[in-house]
Structure formats: C-alpha cells, structure tokens
Amino acid sequence: MNIIKVKVVYALPDIQYIKEVHIDSNSTVKDAILASNLLNTVKNIQFYKNNVGIYNKLVHLNENVKNGDRIEIYRNLIIDPKERRRKRSNICLKK
C-alpha cells in the first residue's frame, strides 16, 4: 500500500479552504474529499450536487487520484455569467 499526498480545495468569494491529505494510492476523488473533512468544515457543500475536478478538469467522484493532484469542489453559479456581464455593462453605460 502506497500513500500519496493530494490537496482538496473549496473556494468561497472571501475564503479558500485547502486541505492536504495523505491517502492510499488506490483512492478516488470521493475518498480524498471525505478524508479532507471539508464536508464537516464547510456546511454549504452539497457533496453529490457540486461538480468536482482535478486541476480545472471535470471528473467523476469515482475517478482515481494521483500523487500531487489538486481536487477542486466547485460551487454552483449564483448568476449566469452572461447576465452578470449584461448588468455590469448597463451600469457602465448609465454613468
């Protein structure tokens, strides 16, 4: 059994949670997230609803992780990016 080191990351607008965990080399993304204890630290993570990725590439929870991976838990969008740009440009035009 080999032990690897990965980081699990969850970012909010005002704070980032970064947990480094040591897990078995046969572990999955789900195993790493559970080992990080972020689900208990940050209450608004909806484990099975949020998308996850490794270095900005979407992956499934059952994907195997490698040493040095950065597992990212993504937040749901609050507002559509196109709508936000539209609102911002309207504000700038009014000034």
Curated annotation (Swiss-Prot):
Source taxonomy: Bacteria, Pseudomonadati, Pseudomonadota, Gammaproteobacteria, Enterobacterales
Q: What is this protein called?
A: UPF0125 protein BUsg_244
Which Pfam families does the record associate with it?
Ub-RnfH (PF03658)
The family line of this record is: Belongs to the UPF0125 (RnfH) family.
Give the matching InterPro entries: Mopterin_synth/thiamin_S_b, RnfH, RnfH_sf
Signal peptide per UniProt: none
